[in-house]
Amino acid sequence: MTKSLLRIPYPGPLPPPKIIPRNADSLTGAIAALTEFLTAPPSRSLPDDVLDPASTVLLTGAGLSVASGLADYRGTSGTYTLKKSYRPIYYHEFLASHEARKRYWARSFLGWANLHKAGPNSAHFSIKGLGDMGFARSVITQNVDSFHLKAHPELPTLELHGYLRALICLSCHSKISRDEFQKTLMQLNPIWAAFLEETFFSRANPIKNTAENFTKGFSTNPDGDVDVPGAPYSMFRYPACPNCFQNPPMTTNGLKAKIDVDNDGAWKAGSNVGILKPSVVMFGESIASEVKEAAEQAIDNSGRLLVLGTSLATYSAWRLAKRAKDRGMPIAIINFGGVRGEEEFFHDLQIDQNGGAGVRIEFGTEIILPQLVANLQQIRFSGTDFTKILNPNIEKLKNNKLQDILS
């Protein structure tokens, strides 16, 4: 039985970080440290099998999209900070319960309006800049908002926890656009659609997690849903997989599967196929082996790890940082608040190192990354030959599993 890589929430606060280097508590010092981190010669501790020892792989989380108007988990306006009782739906609950799916899709229906209005911010576009200059070779993201693909489609990006832009049928495995699914939900739930129009579309900006909104009863979550306490979730309807409805699959015992819908095409209890699920890794669900292997290879092929906007609370992300550390890779972390097990990543650094061996800072990624890119561009224009620092082996990179999955 495959071990489930749980997205463990760690709702409690993590210990505060120790800023590294010590002068990186100022914006100027932090930019200098990150510049040194990205331009330093490859670590001598790296194993001989590293494909591109001068390259950097990025590992990103919900904090990166806060400036886009989305919620994170543990920031000052994060889900776990403002709503201590928050509990996500688990994969086994989604599979087993028609009522649980009604609640999930009702909340997702409201949350999709927020996500649709939002888009990449300056941090995402700065990552494009790092890629264009040759500093970033690939991105591993825990985020499901697709902002990386919009901001830098040419930079290989592995979506570790999937994405919200599509759904997958649990029976026939066909995929459906989330935009098309949203239109169907509006048709099946006209009262909810009117509520959505009045409450969300009439606003100029996306709903954000604030104390005021929590008082009103609204709260947004990083995985793209909105909680409205007291809402009649049991009245919500969601469609069956259109492919399964037209061509019911055979069950394992050789009988044709049963799929019942109401007069409008909504899935009815008693059906045993045709359940649509978001193309994300839910809490308690296993990450696909090919995605797990591609993430490991992205780490193994690079010489540095830059962690952005994540506390690494999920095991699937933390294990990648741990893998990088075990392989002798320098690690830099930009995140507000503590990071899971971060003392293990930095305990062996020399006190007088200036960032080349590791960096730990607390700044908004939307603030520091654009200035980091500007500083690197200024150094480039001053005559520094980055090709002596960056030496990517393009032909070998074309053959790695990350590229295979993304192609």
Regions picked out by a protein language model, each given a short descriptive name:
Residues M1-S407:
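Conserved catalytic core of sirtuin-type NAD+-dependent deacylases
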